[in-house]
Amino acid sequence: MNAKTKTNYMLKEPGVRTKLFIADETIGLGKVNLLELLSEVGSISAAARQMGMSYRRARFLLDSMQSGFCEPLFVTKRGGSNRGGAKLTPLGKDLIRRYRSHVNLVDKQSTEILAWMRSVQIK
């Protein structure tokens, strides 16, 4: 592929994406953001709405992520007159904290290579 062909692609800023793997599951920024939002709003459906996804999709992502852990990341309470909801367990909170800490370390360690990549990236 020559340089002319490459200019047809959307050029993005060089970066690093962090994905963690546990059992058969992948955990990345989107799932961690969903967990964090769930903690803030206390509802899977409200978190899903704020992220622009269906309740079903959000529930699938949360359940698939949770399936890799020996303990729950969140617990739910059925709705109705007492108003249901969801909240993170200590493990869910710990996952968010550890993921964010890991990402910060990776970002700090990546500044030199990302600067180099920006300098050699096709313009």
Please annotate each region the language model reported.
Residues 76-101:
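Basic, amphipathic "hinge/linker" alpha-helix immediately C-terminal to the N-terminal HTH DNA-binding motif
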Residues 67-72:
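Residue cluster at the C-terminal edge of the helix-turn-helix DNA-binding motif
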Residues 52-54:
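Central "turn" residue of the DNA-binding helix-turn-helix
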Residues 38-48:
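Short helix-boundary/capping micro-motifs
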Residues 9-23:
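Short, Lys/Arg-enriched N-terminal segment that forms or immediately precedes the first helix
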